[in-house]
Amino acid sequence: MVSTQQRTDDDSSQPVKASLKSYGITEPLSIAGPSAADVKRNLELEKFLVDEGLYESKEETMRREEVVVRIDQIVKHWVKQLTRQRGYTDQMVEDANAVIFTFGSYRLGVHGPMADIDTLCVGPSYVNREEDFFIFFRDILAEMEEVTELQPVTDAHVPVMKFKFQGISIDLLYASISLLVIPQDLDISNSSVLCDVDEQTVRSLNGCRVADQILKLVPNSEHFRTTLRCLKYWAKKRGVYSNVTGFLGGVNWALLVARLCQFYPNAIPSMLVSRFFRVYTQWRWPNPVMLCAIEEDDLSFPVWDPRKNHRDRYHLMPIITPAYPCMNSSYNVSQSTLRVMTEQFQFGNTICQEIELNKQHWSSLFQQYMFFEAYKNYLQVDVLAADAEDLLAWKGWVESRFRQLTLKIERDTNGMLMCHPQPNEYVDTSKQFRHCAFFMGLQRADGFGGQECQQFDIRGTVDEFRQEVNMYMFWRPGMDVHVSHVRRRQLPSFVFPNGYKRSRQSRHQSQQCREPGDEGVGSLSDSVERYAKRKNDDEIMNSRPEKREKRASCSLHTLDAASPDSSGITTSGTPQIGIVPGPRAECLVTGDLVCNVTSLPNVEVEAEKFISKITELRKFSQYEHTSGSEQILEVDSRALVQSYHDLAEPVAKHVRPDLSALLACEGGQNKEIGHDMGSESINDTDTQHLPRRLNVNEDVDEVEREAKLGEIAGGVLWNGHCGRNLDHEGFVTPANLDSAVENRNLHSDGLFKSGLPEELQSNSLLSGTGKLDDGARSESLQNEMMRHVFLQPIIGLCKS
C-alpha cells in the first residue's frame, strides 16, 4: 500500500474567505475577495487551461496511481530480498519494508498529461544507495518488461534513477534513514528522519518535505494549484522553465506562487495570475522569497544564511525552501537568466493590465516566445553520439554544463555580454547520425558605455567549456560536442516549426539579397557561392557605404569537412568554434564577419577548392567589404567576436508601473499592515503605459500596499544580533554590496533598512554596473587559475 502521504483533496473544500490563521512571515497585502469582473475572468482562464489540454483524463489519472502502487510493491519485495540475503532473522525479513512517497508536480496536484512522476523510496539503514539501489535494484528493473529507457544518474546533485514504467516517466530517488524497520505510516515531515544521514539523503528527503510544507502554508490549495498550473504553462511558453539551464524549475515556481497566495489569501486564480506579475516585477532581487521563518536545528545541517555562508551572498534570486534545512532552490540563476526572467515578468505584467481593461484575452499572455527572432547572434552547441542510449546520457551531461558556459561568458566579458540560453533541444531529422542541438542568444548588456567598438575574447571561454564537458566520467567513443557561432539569418531550418522560417523585414538592403538555402545546411562550396553573390550584390547596392572596410590580410587555413565520424554538423555560415582536434578553440565574429582559426593536418580536396576560390576573390584588393559571409582567417593567434550595439531586439519593453494608477479589482476592505513601509516615486513619463484608476475608494489601500512592497521584499530591520530563527524576508544578499551602500539602504550590520529605493530602477546586477564578485562560481567553485581575458578584450560590440 502506498503511503498515506499521497496527494489528497481534503483541503480543497476550504472557504473562499481565509480563516483567522496567519500565513507567511508578513501581513497580507490585501484580504479582499473577487469582484464580479474577476469571477468572469477566472471562468475564462479556467476554460482556456482546459482547452489547452493542461489536465489529464480520469483514465490517465487512474493509470498513474496504479503505476505508483506497482512501484511500491517492487521496492518492498526488493528490500525483503536483500534482508534475507544478508542473514537477518525470519522476523526481520517479514518486517522489512520500504515506502514510496511522491513529490514535485504530482504531489502538488499540478501535473499534466504525459508528465513524469517524481517518487522517493525510503528504505532501512542497512540498504544503501551506491550498491543496493543503483546496482542491485537497477538489475531488477532491467529484467522487467514494463521498464524501458532505464538510466541511473549517480553523479547528479540529487542521485536519481530515471526510467519509464508502462510508458510513464518515473524519477525515483532513494533515501536510507537510520531505522532498521520502516513503518508504513512514516511521517516524513518530522525532522527526526534526518538524523545520521548524509547531505544527498537530506536533499532526497527534502523534495517530499518541501511539497508537504507548501500545501500547508497556502490559504487555499485549489486556488494555488490552478494558479501554479497556469504560470508553469506560461513559463514554458516564454522559455523560462528550466532549472538546469539557469531559469526556474517546478519547485521554484511553486514557491513563488505560494508566497503570492499568502499576500492575497482570498484572491482567486485570475487575480493571482495578474498580481503575480505585478509583485515580482517590483521585487528587489536578491532579497529572498520565503514562506516561513528560517529555522535552525540541533542537527547542524547548513541552512541558507548569507551572514554566515560566503557562497550564499552570490545568489541572485534566492527562493528559500520552507522545510529544514532551508536552502536556496534557485542557486542556478545567473545574471543573464535573471535579466531574461525580469523582462518576461514585465511582459506578463503589461498583458495582464490590458486583460483587466478587456483589451486583451488570456491567449495573449501565453504567446510563444520567438527566441530565434529576438537576437542577431547565437551560439549553437551540437551534441553527437554513436547511438540513442549514448546520446541520452551524453546530452544530459552537456545540458547540465550548458549553464556553466553562460557563467563563463559573463565572467570573461566582465558581465558586458549577456547570454540567453534556450532550454529546448532541437534535432535535424534529415541527419542519419544521433545528435541534438542547443542554442544561446547573445546580447550586449544594458548600462555599459565606453568605446563605440569594444571587443571581447570568448575563444578561451569556449575552449574551457569544451574541456569541462570532456571530463565526463562515462565518456564513450562517438560522444562529441561542437560549438558554432551563427547569425540569425544563418540559423538552420530545423529550429523552426515545420522547417519554415517566418518572413522578416531585413534591417539592411544587403540582407535582402540572400539565397533561399542561406538558413539551411550546406557545403563549403555553397558557402563560397553565396559569399560571392553577397559581395557582388553589396557592391551594386552600396548598402553600407558609411561603414569602414575591414582588413583581411591574414593567411588562410582549412576547415575540415564535417561528417558524423569526424567533426560533426557544419551549418551554412556556421564556423566551428574550437571543437576540433589540435590547438586552442577559436571563435571569431566581427560584425557580419564570421571567422574561425583551425590547424588540421589532413586537408580535404573540397576545402582546398574553397581556399582557392576565396583567394581569387581577394586578389583585386587587400581590403574588402563583408556582409554576413564566412572567412577562414588566422588573426595573430587570437579570435574575435564582434557584433553591433543592437545585437538583439528587446524582449519586452521596460515599464516601471505607476502604482498609483494600477487597476485592482478588489471588492472588500483591506487590513492595514502593521509596520511602516517606505513609499516609491514613479516617473510620470511611464504612466502612459498603464490603465487609469477605476475605483479609487476601493482600490487605494491595496495600491498603497503594493507601492510599499519593498518593505516586504527588502526592508525588515534586523537588530544586529542573530537569534535561533531567521524570520525576516529582507536580509542583504547582493553579489555587490557596494551598490546597496550607495543607495543608503544598509545599516552597519549589513541589512536593509528602508526597502526599495526612491525610484524603481534596474538592479545593479541586471544593468551590469555592479561587480560580478565571482559570479561564475559553480557548485564545484572554480579556483584562482581561471583566466580573465577582459584585460585584452577582443569581442567588438559596436554601435550601429
From Swiss-Prot:
UniProt xrefs under PANTHER family: NUCLEAR POLY(A) POLYMERASE 2, POLY A POLYMERASE
**What is the uppermost EC class here?**
transferase
Reaction catalysed? RNA(n) + ATP = RNA(n)-3'-adenine ribonucleotide + diphosphate
- Reported phenotype of the disruption mutant: Lethal.
Q: Which cofactor does it need?
A: Mg(2+); Mn(2+)
Question: Where expressed (tissue)?
Answer: Mostly expressed in flowers (highly in the style, receptacle and pedicel, but weakly in the vasculature of sepals) and hypocotyls, and, to a lower extent, in roots and stems. Barely detected in leaves (petioles and vascular system).
Q: Which InterPro entries match?
A: NT_sf (IPR043519), NuclTrfase_I-like_C (IPR011068), PolA_pol_cen_dom (IPR007012), PolA_pol_NTPase (IPR048840), PolA_pol_RNA-bd_dom (IPR007010)
Classify the source by domain of life. Answer: Eukaryota
Protein name as catalogued: Nuclear poly(A) polymerase 2
* Keyword terms: ATP-binding, Cytoplasm, Magnesium, Metal-binding, mRNA processing, Nucleotide-binding, Nucleotidyltransferase, Nucleus, Repeat, Transferase
- Provide the site residues for: Interaction with RNA: K162, N332, R403, K408, E616
Q: Which residues form a coiled coil?
A: none
Q: Which organism is it from?
A: Arabidopsis thaliana (Mouse-ear cress)
Q: Is Nucleus included in the keywords of this UniProt record?
A: yes
